[in-house]
């Protein structure tokens, strides 16, 4: 089910004339980058996964084809509750290829938040890890299906353990053919719904168009003089704006590398920084503080 968006006509005209907004979608930018640098590493994570732009594009195309086969249409919401894994980017790209709206969720959310958010955004498909932090997130949602009015499928992201009670992401990718042609989406259409953390009430969904995200991340890269040679480290949750926009989206807009970390510790962060020769990192103040403290404690 698509969402009708209303724009301030004068502001939209100004943004388009200024070059902030255009007709292109995030998917258009992804395809351009994947064609330009197919063999370049697009994303890695701390579990050793590494995908080139070409390989990631192929896997996302297979998942996109499956989404369409399950009745997903442009504007439908697809939710995924994943930590900093390469699979997060893969699912996001599959949504871009089909015109589905990405709804990334925080891994820390439990039953109450999940039921609220999934019903609020009317998500049709939900992805969650089979195992993460000694929990089984995908099994958490299965008993709640009768409370989720719009949900049709639950997919287990079987990165750390096999999927025993749900569809498995790896099997979907293995058994699906690549999508023959991505669905064309206009820049003014809805791209993602990011939910607030809900510290003062239930989480609230913030609707972002392709143009919203593109204007933000092009400005971010330009202001920091980031290029295709940069390597972005993202220790923040990908369900937050910082992780979703700066850690996953911005890198592929410019053909850079995204380095993801699922559980932040200063030691793990410093290890990835050195291993991947990262040049850029974004995070909240506590992340930076802990990182600097760890550096100070290292032997000279």
Regions found by a protein language model. Name each.
Residues 103, 109-143, 216-233, 265-279:
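Conserved ATP-dependent adenylate/AMP-binding module captured primarily in the ANL superfamily
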Residues 214-231, 239-280, 286-298:
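Conserved AMP-binding/adenylation subdomain of ANL enzymes
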Residues 22-23, 31, 39-85, 89-93, ...:
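Conserved AMP-binding/adenylate-forming core of the ANL superfamily
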Residues 38-39, 156-161, 174-195, 202, ...:
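Conserved pre-ATP/AMP-binding loop-to-beta segment of ANL
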Residues 7-9, 132-187, 294-297:
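ANL superfamily adenylate-forming
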Residues 122-125, 144-155, 232-233, 279-283, ...:
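Conserved helix-loop-beta element of the AMP-binding
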Residues 50-54, 191-215:
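Conserved AMP-binding A3 loop
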Residues 65, 77, 83-103, 107-111, ...:
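A short helix-loop-beta submotif of the ANL/AMP-binding
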